[in-house]
């Protein structure tokens, strides 16, 4: 049968930008209608035996989930809004991962079966199952065309077999009259042909792409990996508590969870389930929306979460809901505490950013400066922050100011992530335009325009080294993760790439430095977490999980790495000797 890449929850990838979605949006435009209402589509098989009804809401939801699972976060948000996913009555927690891929695969198998069956219901004699690509299967008259091609090939094979039989009979007759010396030469030639034929077949079988084999010397043994299960959908994010071994995770099952991995916890790891609910008819009911962002405050006493339901929430470390923050008019994409712990900053698909008072839960100020969804935010200090958007702009805003104090323009596609360096002097940004740019508040244009990746750059991280860090004697570095399957380390002072890390085989969605800056963790949709030496660029540890990796993070001591995955699992890697 046909094998689809991504038949599991680890789906294939394409660029996360808006351009990658145009064909999908166009294809389903007729089903949604301009207002995104639900329509019924009556379908039947080509021969008219079976009929069924499919609503456009159902189609839209499966496409939306596929985009999320594939890592197309920006496109998923846009598509969800345009198709009014939030207004549908579909309970997303009941839909299994990779549902769209699964139903497409079943459709392919149905077409393959049709090709193998005659009009009268009998199976072609000796016919192998025909392997199709998805594009082959949607072509007009594919069944009739493939059946006709098979009949012609079968006729040729029968004619060739008859000719070969006649030739063999003639050769056998001639062999009885030839000399013994000549007859001894032929078997050697025949044996050589047989051996070469087997070699050729073996070569063709082994010529398929395989997952990279992990070197046994760097592979993290299963005894050092703890797999935490409990989430019922993909886990988009995870973050360690800054003072203890509590790992928070956020999922498409509308929950966040706090996993206790402290050595003194009884019975191994335990989990607290933080259910994200909304008020309906005087009752709290599950929101059925993804938890898209989370962040611990500096002293580790409070956890903030952002959800696709448009609400930010503050939780205590023991799992109690402390506050619900509601002013965004759509999904929340990013959320950050300031260092002091008195404000929370959020970015929304409603094109705004909001500073919240963490104590009262009130919005201190809303900043409506972007012309498209805001994708990321980062604090420069306790009252000043930067935000980026699909509008290709970066704004630097300050609490109390009614306009941006600085606007950086230069990217030619949506800006995916922004990060201030530890000193707050330099701002790094990465974009779907495949560039990494470094900005200074002292000038209008970027001070570095770094162009080395050949696909979209999804995220960036500064090392915790250099001035204003606990590792002042180590040089500062910047790491970038791209859809080209590579991670790059940069010397920002010189504006050069010092290492290109190339072991991943799928887009890389997350990178994180160890607290001392000596190691870098990377997570990719190839299901692998790699640990690299930042000085040499060498791979020192590697782990292959069971789902595509969305996020990686280090605990405060630097001896454990957490990773969240598309199959609903959360992995904890113990790097102690």
From Swiss-Prot:
GO CC aspect terms: histone deacetylase complex; mitotic spindle; nucleoplasm; nucleus; transcription repressor complex
Domain F-box-like: 92-137
RNA-binding found in the keyword field: no
PROSITE patterns, per the entry: LISH, WD_REPEATS_1, WD_REPEATS_2, WD_REPEATS_REGION
PTM annotation (Phosphoserine): residues: 183
GO BP, sorted A to Z: negative regulation of transcription by RNA polymerase II; positive regulation of canonical Wnt signaling pathway; positive regulation of DNA-templated transcription; positive regulation of transcription by RNA polymerase II; proteasome-mediated ubiquitin-dependent protein catabolic process; protein stabilization; proteolysis; regulation of transcription by RNA polymerase II
Record's keyword terms, sorted: Acetylation, Activator, Congenital hypothyroidism, Deafness, Disease variant, Isopeptide bond, Nucleus, Phosphoprotein, Repeat, Transcription, Transcription regulation, Ubl conjugation, Ubl conjugation pathway, WD repeat
Molecular function in Gene Ontology: histone binding; identical protein binding; transcription cis-regulatory region binding; transcription corepressor activity
Matches recorded under SMART domains: LisH, WD40
Expression (tissue specificity): Ubiquitous.
Pfam families found in the cross-reference section: LisH, WD40
Crosslink (Glycyl lysine isopeptide (Lys-Gly) (interchain with G-Cter in SUMO2)) position: 340
WD repeats: 230-269, 286-325, 327-366, 369-409, 410-449, 452-500, 503-542, 544-576
Nucleus is among the record's keywords: yes
Stored Gene3D superfamilies: 1.20.960.30, YVTN repeat-like/Quinoprotein amine dehydrogenase
Entry's localization field: Nucleus
Effect of residue 108 to A/Q: Reduced interaction with NCOR2 and GPS2
Location (main, coarse): nucleus
Binding partners and assembly: Homotetramer; dimer of dimers. Component of the N-Cor repressor complex, at least composed of NCOR1, NCOR2, HDAC3, TBL1X, TBL1R, CORO2A and GPS2. Interacts with GPS2 (when sumoylated); leading to protect GPS2 against degradation by the proteasome. Component of a E3 ubiquitin ligase complex containing UBE2D1, SIAH1, CACYBP/SIP, SKP1, APC and TBL1X. Probably part of other corepressor complexes, that do not contain NCOR1 and NCOR2. Interacts with histones H2B, H3a and H4. Interacts with MECP2; recruits TBL1X to the heterochromatin foci. Interacts with USP44.
Family classification: Belongs to the WD repeat EBI family.
Function, in words: F-box-like protein involved in the recruitment of the ubiquitin/19S proteasome complex to nuclear receptor-regulated transcription units. Plays an essential role in transcription activation mediated by nuclear receptors. Probably acts as integral component of corepressor complexes that mediates the recruitment of the 19S proteasome complex, leading to the subsequent proteasomal degradation of transcription repressor complexes, thereby allowing cofactor exchange.
Disease: Hypothyroidism, congenital, non-goitrous, 8: A form of central hypothyroidism, a disorder characterized by sub-optimal thyroid hormone secretion, due to insufficient stimulation by the thyroid stimulating hormone of an otherwise normal thyroid gland. It may be caused by congenital or acquired disorders of the pituitary gland or hypothalamus. CHNG8 is a congenital, X-linked, relatively mild form which may be accompanied by hearing loss in some patients.
UniProt comment concerning the protein's domains: The F-box-like domain is related to the F-box domain, and apparently displays the same function as component of ubiquitin E3 ligase complexes.
Name assigned to this protein: F-box-like/WD repeat-containing protein TBL1X
Annotated source species: Homo sapiens (Human)
Organism taxonomic ancestry: Eukaryota, Metazoa, Chordata, Craniata, Vertebrata
Gene that this polypeptide is encoded by: TBL1X
């Amino acid at each position: 049968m046909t094998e689809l890449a991504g038949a599991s929850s680890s789906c294939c990838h394409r660029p996360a930008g808006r351009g990658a979605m145009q064909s999908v949006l166009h294809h389903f435009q007729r089903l949604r209608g301009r207002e995104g209402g639900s329509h019924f589509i009556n379908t039947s098989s080509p021969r008219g035996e079976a009929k069924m009804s499919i609503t456009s809401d159902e189609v839209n939801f499966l496409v939306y989930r596929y985009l999320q699972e594939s890592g197309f976060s920006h496109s998923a948000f846009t598509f969800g809004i345009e198709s009014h996913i939030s207004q549908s009555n579909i309970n997303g927690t009941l839909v299994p991962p990779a549902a769209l891929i699964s139903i497409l695969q079943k459709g392919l198998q149905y077409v393959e079966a049709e090709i193998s069956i005659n009009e009268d219901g009998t199976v072609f004699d000796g016919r192998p199952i025909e392997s199709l690509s998805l594009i082959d299967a949607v072509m007009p008259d594919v069944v009739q065309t493939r059946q006709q091609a098979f009949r012609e090939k079968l006729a040729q094979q029968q004619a060739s077999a008859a000719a070969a039989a006649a030739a063999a009979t003639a050769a056998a007759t001639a062999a009885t009259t030839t000399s013994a010396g000549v007859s001894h030469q032929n078997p050697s030639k025949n044996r050589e042909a047989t051996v070469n034929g087997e070699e050729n077949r073996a070569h063709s079988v082994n010529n398929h792409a395989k997952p990279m084999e992990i070197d046994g010397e760097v592979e993290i043994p299963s005894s050092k990996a703890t797999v935490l299960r409990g989430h019922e959908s993909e886990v988009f994010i995870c973050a360690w508590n800054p003072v203890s071994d509590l790992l928070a995770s956020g999922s498409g099952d509308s929950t966040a969870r706090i996993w206790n991995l402290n050595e003194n916890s009884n019975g191994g790891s335990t989990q607290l389930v933080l259910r994200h609910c909304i008020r309906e008819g005087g009752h709290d009911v599950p929101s059925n929306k993804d938890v898209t962002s989370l962040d611990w405050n500096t002293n580790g006493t409070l956890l903030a979460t952002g959800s696709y339901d448009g609400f930010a929430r503050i939780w205590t470390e023991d799992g109690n809901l402390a506050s619900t923050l509601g002013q965004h008019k759509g999904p929340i994409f990013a959320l950050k505490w300031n260092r002091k712990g008195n404000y929370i900053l959020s970015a929304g698909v409603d094109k705004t950013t909001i500073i919240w008072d963490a104590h009262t839960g009130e919005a201190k100020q809303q900043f409506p400066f972007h012309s498209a969804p805001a994708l990321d935010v980062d604090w420069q200090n306790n009252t000043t922050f930067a935000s980026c958007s699909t509008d290709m702009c970066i704004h630097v805003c300050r609490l109390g100011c009614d306009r941006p104090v600085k606007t950086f323009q230069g990217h030619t596609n949506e800006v995916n992530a922004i990060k201030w360096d530890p000193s707050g002097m330099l701002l790094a940004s990465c974009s779907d335009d495949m560039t990494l740019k470094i900005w200074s508040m002292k000038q209008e244009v970027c001070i570095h325009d770094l162009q080395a990746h050949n696909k979209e750059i999804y995220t960036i991280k500064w090392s915790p080294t250099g001035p204003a860090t606990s590792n002042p004697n180590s040089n500062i570095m910047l790491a970038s993760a791209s859809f080209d399957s590579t991670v790059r380390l940069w010397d920002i002072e010189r504006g050069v790439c010092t290492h290109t890390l190339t072991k991943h085989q799928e887009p890389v969605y997350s990178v994180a430095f160890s607290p001392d800056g000596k190691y870098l963790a990377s997570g990719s949709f190839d299901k692998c977490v790699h640990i690299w030496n930042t000085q040499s660029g060498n791979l020192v540890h590697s782990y292959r999980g069971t789902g595509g990796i969305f996020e990686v993070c280090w605990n405060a001591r630097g001896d454990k790495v957490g990773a969240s995955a598309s199959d609903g699992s959360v992995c904890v890697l113990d790097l102690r000797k």
